[in-house]
Regions:
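Hydrophobic faces of transmembrane alpha-helices in multi-pass small-molecule transporters and flippases
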Residues: 1-20, 46, 50, 122, ...
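Short alpha-helical transmembrane segments in multi-pass integral membrane proteins
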Residues: 1-5, 62-128, 169-207
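Structural signal for membrane-spanning alpha-helices in multi-pass inner-membrane proteins
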Residues: 3, 18, 22, 49-52, ...
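Hydrophobic alpha-helical transmembrane segments in multi-pass membrane proteins
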Residues: 7-19, 23, 52, 84-93, ...
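Helix-terminus/linker motif at the lipid-water interface of multi-pass membrane proteins
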Residues: 8, 15-42, 46, 64, ...
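Membrane-helix interface segments
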Residues: 32-33, 148-150, 175-176
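Small-residue-rich hydrophobic transmembrane alpha-helices
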Residues: 36-94, 98-100, 132-154
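Short runs within selected transmembrane alpha-helices of multi-pass transporters and secretion channels
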Residues: 52-55, 125-144, 150-162, 166, ...
């Protein structure tokens, strides 16, 4: 039961990001800002599903080899999942940065002010896709090796604490770019927490 809570919270975090993001965008940029942010809300869950699929595909392999005590196979499977997710993150970021005009044009006419807001903001928003990949796969890893507490802590920090704090605080420092960079910063902070756990435990495959 405890292991499944992290999966539930990962899904709930998307809703939290959307609600908090809508509040911040309408506060700073009005209806045009919300319209621009809605584009990110359309494909952010799709990217999450890709990363989540990678993590879930690796979970049976990780769980089995963890159960039989084969630490080397656990490590190699985790690295393969991480490499696949990071590669996808690089591709998603590159596509968003290179084709931001085309992506926005699928949702908003070029004559609307929201178009320019979205074109400028999407590459900033996409800068966190690589860290997003590492975080989601890492949460799945912790679930697979029966480390429910780190998985739950990372999920709560990522999806609720860091996300809300960054969305509320970063725009005060960076104005409009800070709104778009809030989610990437939350992913980076989560990544740093994961690294801290890694160095504390030395080997993730040990309980």
């Amino acid at each position: 039961c405890h292991l499944g809570v992290s999966t539930f919270l990962c899904e709930a975090a998307i809703a939290c990001m959307m609600f908090a993001g809508n509040y911040v965008f309408i506060h700073y940029l009005g209806e045009d800002g919300v319209a621009a942010f809605s584009i990110a809300c359309y494909f952010f869950p799709i990217i999450f599903m890709v990363y989540n699929a990678i993590g879930q595909s690796a979970q049976p392999i990780l769980s089995y080899h963890f159960g039989v005590g084969d630490a080397m196979r656990v490590r190699s499977a985790f690295r393969l999942a991480l490499g696949t997710a990071v590669t996808c993150g690089l591709v998603f970021f590159a596509l968003t940065a290179l084709f931001n005009h085309q992506i926005v044009a699928m949702f908003i006419d070029r004559s609307y002010p929201a178009y320019d807001i979205a074109v400028a903001g999407l590459p900033l928003f996409a800068s966190g896709f690589i860290f997003f990949a590492v975080n989601i796969v890492s949460i799945g890893y912790f679930q697979s090796v029966e480390r429910a507490r780190p998985a739950m802590m990372i999920t709560v920090l990522r999806g609720f604490v860091f996300m809300v704090l960054c969305l509320l605080g970063l725009p005060l420092l960076l104005k409009e770019p800070g709104i778009w960079l809030a989610v990437p910063l939350a992913e980076i902070l989560t990544f740093l927490v994961i690294m801290a756990i890694y160095y504390r435990k030395h080997q993730w495959v040990r309980r």
